[in-house]
C-alpha cells in the first residue's frame, strides 16, 4: 500500500491512531502545511529509506489535519521542521504513507518516492 495525504491519515486512524482536527491546535505552523507551490522540506529518515543523497527535500503539502498519536505498528520516517509527521511505514506490512503529494513534485523526492517504493516492494516479493 502506498498512501498519499489523506491516505496517511486514514491508515493511521485504522491502526488506532488519532489526528489533530486542525494542525494549528497542535502548535504547528499551518502555513507550512498549506503551501500549494512546494512546501516545507521534511526532515528525518526518508532519504535513507529512498537511498537518495541528502536528508531534506521540498514537498507539496496542503493539509489542515495531521497525525496526533501514531497508530500501532507504524514507524515515523519523516517530520517537517515544526514536528508534523510527514511519512510513516508499517513495521511488518508493506504499507508506506506520506502526508504530501509526490505526484505534484516535479523532481527529487517526488519522482524518486514511487519508484523506490515499487522497487523495494518488488524486491521484497521476489526474495520470499
Task: Report each predicted region and the residues it spans.
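Generic low-polarity alpha-helical segments
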Residues: 2-4, 42, 50, 94, ...
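Acyltransferase
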Residues: 98-128
